């Protein structure tokens, strides 16, 4: 887990890099910037600990995280589907915190999320991946039905 870095609006340069702030909207994207000194890689999860406390998003492109955001780096092979599965679980735990409490890094490290496990008691990454693949397919099929008249 890594804390994001402060970047004031005055120091932002317009560009194509995502700037992830403490927002509950648009995957946390609050600006597109040219600044690239503190970019985090794709395939990570962002968690707001100030402002929109607990808002959690999977990031599929590199980005700059504001200083109100913590970035979670996986210690396992995290696919996009696994990231999309885990993000709402983290968000659920974060609901216990508010703007006044904040979800500081030291507190966040002590919190626990519950994951599905396999017969050996290890996280069932395969299940999480296939579950989200089905959710995405079902959602896509559902939306396609609205486009057919």
Where are these regions (language model features)?
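General detector of folded, globular domains
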Residues: 19, 49, 57, 71, ...
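Short, glycine-/Ser/Thr-/acidic-enriched flexible segments
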Residues: 25-26, 52
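A short beta-sheet element
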Residues: 31-87
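Glycine-anchored helix-breaking recognition loops at helix->coil/strand junctions
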Residues: 68, 86-118, 142, 146-147
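A generic structural motif
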Residues: 75-78, 117-121
């Amino acid at each position: 887990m890594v804390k994001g870095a402060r970047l004031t609006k005055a120091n932002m340069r317009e560009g194509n890099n995502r700037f992830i702030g403490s927002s509950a909207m648009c995957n946390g994207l609050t600006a597109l910037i040219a600044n690239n000194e503190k970019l985090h890689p794709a395939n990570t999860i962002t968690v707001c600990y100030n402002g929109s406390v607990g808002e959690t998003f999977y990031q599929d492109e590199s980005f700059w995280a504001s200083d109100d955001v913590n970035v979670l780096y996986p210690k396992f092979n995290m696919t996009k589907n696994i990231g999309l599965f885990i993000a709402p679980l983290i968000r659920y735990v974060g609901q216990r915190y508010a703007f006044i409490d904040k979800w500081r890094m030291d507190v966040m490290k002590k919190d626990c999320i519950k994951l599905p496990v396999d017969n050996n008691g290890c996280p069932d990454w395969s299940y999480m991946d296939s579950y989200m693949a089905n959710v995405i397919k079902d959602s896509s099929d559902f939306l396609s039905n609205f486009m057919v008249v």
